[in-house]
Each structure stands twice: as structure tokens, then as C-alpha cells.
């Protein structure tokens, strides 16, 4: 049997190279979360933990949320779009959707809570510092152009470099 190359448990015990603290919009004030970014030799390990997500009791209607890195540098907005200045999906290579560097796996809500860890080669940590993390109200369909029809932006956080955690 081949030995595992990345030890997520060991990485999660270390200080990440960057992190974003997520806060819900005025309509979703209970959403709070943290996304941590760890650079590895195989790509970036992303660890996300989010609380206060909207949920319904119907077992067949469990929410799935679009989860992206956006190109903007702040979470300001207006009456129509709470986080308008977060901009579009981070897409430095101008690839079609769903191949944007900022297209990430969706968050699966569990009674208002989501936890996920994944590895991606779409970016390096240094490339995304200063960008924004967005949670959308609906899942990304990974088809619609330009950004997957993921609905309203319900939470946002700026990705910041971590020197001292």
C-alpha cells in the first residue's frame, strides 16, 4: 500500500498561510465562518468551517451553497447586491466556467453547519491574498455562464495573510 503524502491532521494543527473570516449579510447575520489556506507541494489545502447557514427541516431539501473565491478586495456593496465589490469569480486565466481558479466545491449544509477540507491546484496561496471568499444562497450549477447561477451572495470575507495566528 502506498503511503499518504499529505497529512491533513498535521497541517490543520499548524498556522495557515492565509485565512478569511466570513460574515453573513444583513439578511443572514448569523452566518460566521473561517476558511484557512495551507500551501503544500501538491497544491493548496483549503479547510472551511461555517455556522449559521440557512436550513430547512425537510430531509429532502438540505441546502447546498455555492462557494467561491472572488476577484474583489472587499466585502462592501449596495442595496441590490450586499457584497457587490467582491466582484466576479477569481479567474486570472479567463477560463470559461466552471474552470475559474476561484470555482470551489460546494458547501453542504448540515443543520446550519458546514465543514470541508479539500486540495486544489488552481491557485497558490500568495495569489489569493487580498481576494474575497463568498458563500452563495444556491449551489453552483457548474454550467451557466459566467458564474454558475449560484444566487445571492450571503456571506463574505477577505483572504488575509497569516503571519501570526
Q: What does each of the following model-derived ranges do?
A:
Residues 1-165:
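N-terminal leader/targeting pre-sequences
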